[in-house]
Amino acid sequence: MAYTTFSQTKNDQLKEPMFFGQPVNVARYDQQKYDIFEKLIEKQLSFFWRPEEVDVSRDRIDYQALPEHEKHIFISNLKYQTLLDSIQGRSPNVALLPLISIPELETWVETWAFSETIHSRSYTHIIRNIVNDPAVVFDDIVTNEQIQKRAEGISAYYDELIEMTSYWHLLGEGTHTVNGKTVVVNLRELKKKLYLCLMSVNALEAIRFYVSFACSFAFAERELMEGNAKIIRLIARDEALHLTGTQHMLNLLRSGVDDPEMAEIAEECKQECYDLFVQAAQQEKEWADYLFRDGSMIGLNKDILCQYVEYITNIRMQAVGLDLPFQTRSNPIPWINTWLVSDNVQVAPQEVEVSSYLVGQIDSEVDTDDLSNFQL
């Protein structure tokens, strides 16, 4: 099926599935098949922020005073987060947009990916402030063995989906020879690759950031690197939205409401999805071990972080219909919720950047009934 950027075939977008229907033609928002994506778009737009709004000048002084093992923890996490958001800033667009059939989902994916580019810019803003030569930090990302291990697990599902999608659009279903290699293009197999890719992205948004988040917030609990923590808090707020988006996509697909065949595929893939999540959790535990190889920090150590990874992995897997792999049922670092739930902290606006401020949140829909109780 050849892809077109504007299909001239008239269709009812309310009858299209989320994926593998007719490509979106008119980007219209007066109607939605799934209004959850419209709500996510509006929420993400109201969250808009720029890293330059946050003052990180004090962080340079704090960073210079950190012991070497804490510098390792801080800078390693920034490298890892830069990798994750470098992938997420481009991959959802490249992998998902050519397959999407409804405008609200198309715009949500574009909005989601754009916000990830702001996260990447934020890490540059932080790193440029604390080190004299940012290139030393960025150049290490593609050579650091610990980071590369994680990159392979994240990018493989995206790459397989993108490759198979290009064959499907160019050649259609069937058995083809491409550069001397036999390629079998099958729509059901492509749907399976999409489902696994979405589950992989869900695992990324669900657990892969949170070891780094916990460390950033632990520094701020000691009144260190507070500018960084404010930025990370804004990033965490965005990531919670992105997680909600992938969870809704997966749950709509596995329920069969959107595409009955996807419900069968979800059942077939259940074990692979389970293994995918457990592997991601294991990699995060290994990352915690790498971070604390030279010593722990006040309020946080490897064991506590590993318990936290197990705790959030259980919650995230349950949200997409998977069995729970770990015994940990309580949050070992409850103070982190103060940072992750943006409404929990009240501050005086003149004293600090207000991370809970929203823009564009006025409801402009006014009905005559709203004025019925007014008397002149």
Swiss-Prot record:
Protein name as annotated? Ribonucleoside-diphosphate reductase 1 subunit beta
Instruction: Please give the cofactor(s) recorded in the UniProt entry for this protein.
Output: Fe cation
Task: Name the keywords, alphabetized.
Answer: Deoxyribonucleotide synthesis, Iron, Metal-binding, Oxidoreductase
One GO BP annotation is: deoxyribonucleotide biosynthetic process
Reaction catalysis annotation: a 2'-deoxyribonucleoside 5'-diphosphate + [thioredoxin]-disulfide + H2O = a ribonucleoside 5'-diphosphate + [thioredoxin]-dithiol
The enzyme class is oxidoreductase
Q: Report the protein's function.
A: Provides the precursors necessary for DNA synthesis. Catalyzes the biosynthesis of deoxyribonucleotides from the corresponding ribonucleotides. R2 contains the tyrosyl radical required for catalysis.
Q: Which gene encodes it?
A: nrdB
Record's signal peptide: none
Identify the EC number(s). Answer: 1.17.4.1
The annotation note on the cofactor reads: Binds 2 iron ions per subunit.
Q: What is the lineage of its organism?
A: Bacteria, Pseudomonadati, Pseudomonadota, Gammaproteobacteria, Enterobacterales
- Its source organism is Salmonella typhimurium (strain LT2 / SGSC1412 / ATCC 700720)
In the record, the note on similarity to other proteins reads: Belongs to the ribonucleoside diphosphate reductase small chain family.
Relay the record's extra comment.
A substrate-binding catalytic site, located on R1, is formed only in the presence of the second subunit R2.
